Amino acid sequence: MNIKYILPALALATTSAWAQQKELSSGIDKANMDLTANPGVDFYQYATGGWTAAHPLTPEYARYAQFDALAENNRKQLRELIEEMAAKQHKQGSLEQKIGSLYHLAMDSVRRNKEDYAPIKALLEEVQALDSRKAVQYEMAKLQSMGIPNFFSFGCDADLKNAKWNLMQVYQGGISMGERDYYLENDEPTKKIREAYRQYVKNLFTMTGMNAEEATQAMEAVLKIETRIATASYSATKQRDVEGNYHKMSYQKLLTDFPGIDWSTLFLLNGVPAFNEISVSQPEPIHEVEKILAECSVEELKAYLYYKVVNDASSSLSDRFRQEAFYFYNHTMSGAEQDRPRWKRAVAAVEGALGMAVGKLYVEKYFPESSKQRMVELVKNLQVALGERIDAQKWMSEATKKQAHDKLNSFYVKIGYPDEWMDYSKLDIDENLSYYENMVRATQFMSNYYVEKHVNKPVDRTEWLMTPQTINAYYNPTTNEICFPAGILQPPFFNAEADDACNYGAIGVVIGHEMTHGFDDQGAQFDKDGNLKNWWTEKDKTEFEKRTKVMRDFFDNIKVLPDLHANGQLTLGENTADHGGLNIAYQALQNAMKLHPLDKKDGFTPEQRFFLSYGLIWANNTREAMLRQLVKTDPHSPARWRVNGALPHIDAWYKAFNITSKAPLFIPKKNRVEVW
C-alpha cells in the first residue's frame, strides 16, 4: 500500500499489540553462531560462524548469503505458482497463458539445441550486409529497440533538478565486461580476466560460422572499440558524483554538441516521441563514441554490432552458447563452478519478463496482511528515532535540522506491493516463435511501456522500481521514497514470531539504512521534494563532509585480500547508511523498551540480540573471484566488513558485549564515525 506517513510530533507507535498477544521468541539460534569466537576480535565470525559452516558453497554459487538462502525459498514458491499456470491450457492472450507459455519455452532446451543460433541468424546476416556508416548507425538504433545494448544507453527518468517531471537521459555503456577497470588495469587477476574475455569473444565468432582468422580479426575490433569506450568512461566512483553526472540541454543542443550520432533515427526507431530537453549524463564517452563511429572502419563497427547480438542472445540460445557465456561471466569473472539448474533459469526468465504479474500471485498466496501492518508501525518508530537522532547532532545548526526534519516528514513509504498492477495486455507470448524471439518481445514491451509512461510525462510516485517478490529494499532520492517489498519481509530480516530486539536489529536496521540514504553523501544533496538542491548551511555542509571522510578513510584502509583494499569512496553511501541504520534502529529499540521492557532470553540481553540479528543478516560465503569483482563494482562493502567495519563505530555495541580497548576491533571514541 502506498501511504505517505507524516512523522507525528510526539506520538510513538510500538509493536506492543503483538507482544501482548503471545510470548515472542528471542529470534536467536545459537547454531548460527560460533560461540568459540571472541566478539571483540571477529564479531562477524561470532554472529555467523555456525551459519557459514553449515552453508558451504555449492558449485552453483560464487557467493551464498542469507539473501540467497531466502531467495532459494522464494524461488521454490514462485516455481510452484508458475508451474501451476504451465500445467494447464489457457486462453491465448491471458496472463496465465503468457506465464505458462514463457516457462514452457524457457524449459524446452531440446528445441533450443535443435535451433542452435537460427533465431539470430537473419539478424547476423543483416549486420554483415551493412555497407556504410549510415547503415551502421541505423542498425545500432534498431538493435537498441530490440533491447540489444551497444555503444551507450538511454532512458527517461526523473529530472534531478525538476523531480516532478521525467527527463530523457543518455548514459555511458557499450562495454560488455561492465566496469572500465577490466579493460584498463594491469594487475594479474584483471589481466587473466581480460585474456579470457578475448577468448570468449573469439569463440562466439567461431561458433556462428567464422573461421579462426576471421574470428581473431573480429575479436580485435571488438576489444579495440570497447577499450576506447572504457578509457573515456567514468569510473564507478566518479558516477557517484551526482552533480558531475547531470548535463541538461535542449534537444537542439544535443544535435549541435553531439553531431556524430544519428539521434533522430535512434529515437524514431525506439518509439520515442518528440521532446524538448535531455541530459547527457557522461558526455566524454558519448563524444568518444562519435569518434569511434567516424574513425573505425565499417568492418570493425560491424564486428562490434555482430558480437553484441550474439552476446546478448547467448542465454536464450542453445546450450553451447549458454554454457560459453556462463563460463566467462559466471565462472571466470565470479568463480561459480556450475550453472543454475534449468528450472531456476526458467523461473528467472519469467520473473524478468512478467515480474509484476508473478508478484501479484506471490503476494496473494504468501504475504500476510499482518506483516504489512507490523511494518507500518516499525517504519513509524524508525522515523521517530531518526528525528531524535537529527535533534541530537550537536554539530548541526537549527536551520539545517529543520530542513532535515522537513525531508524526513516527507518520506513516501511503500510496503509489500503496489496498489495498481502493471498491465501486460500488449505483451504477446507465442510458443510458435523461438524462446529468443519471445524474450525480445518482452524487452520491447517493457521499453514501450516505459516510453509511454515516462516521456513528456510527470513522475508517477506510485510506480514501484522493484517487484514485490524481490528480497531487497530501496530509497529513491528523486521521489524521496523508501520501499520494502514483500520478499524481504520474512526471516531472517523480519520475524513475526520474534520480539523487538531481533526485528529492530534486522529489518529495523534495513529500514533505518534506507532512511539514511536520504541523508548520505548523495541523498543529502536532494531536498524534500527530490530536487538536487542544497539545503545545508555552508558550515554544516563542511562539517558533514569532514565526518563522512572519516568513514571513507576507515574503509580505504581495510584489506579485503592481501593485495586488495576496499574502496571507501565507492562504498561511502552504503557505509553511511549502515552506520545510520544501526544508530536509528538501536534508538528505536530503546524507545520501544521504555514502554515494554524486554528480558534476557537464551542467554542474551536485548541489546546483544539486536547486534547479533544485524550480524546474521550478512552471513555469507564468497569465492575470491567474486570478492574481487564486488570490490571493483559494488557500492556495498563486502559482508564481513558491513559487520566488523560498521559495529566498531557504534558506541552501544561496546557496552553490549563489554568490548575493551584491548580488543582488535576497538576504535578510540575520538576516531569513530559520528554522522547520524
Regions found by a protein language model. Give the residues of each.
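Bacterial Sec-dependent N-terminal signal peptides
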Residues: 1-22
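Short secondary-structure subsegments characteristic of cysteine-rich extracellular domains
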Residues: 12, 60-82, 213-232, 503-509, ...
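Hydrophobic/aromatic-rich, well-ordered segments within soluble, folded domains that form packed cores
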Residues: 32-53, 183, 187-206, 398, ...
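Noncatalytic, helix-rich "gating/capping" subdomain that lines the substrate-entry/channel surface
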Residues: 85-377, 381
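Active-site-surrounding "flap" and adjacent substrate/cofactor-binding loops of secreted or lumenal enzymes
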Residues: 37-41, 46-107
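Intrinsically disordered, low-complexity linker/terminal regions across diverse proteins
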Residues: 71, 222, 257-260, 279-283, ...
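Short, solvent-exposed loop/turn and secondary-structure capping segments
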Residues: 30, 54-58, 154-155, 179-181, ...
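Short, Gly/Pro- and small/polar-rich lid/capping loops
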Residues: 21-31
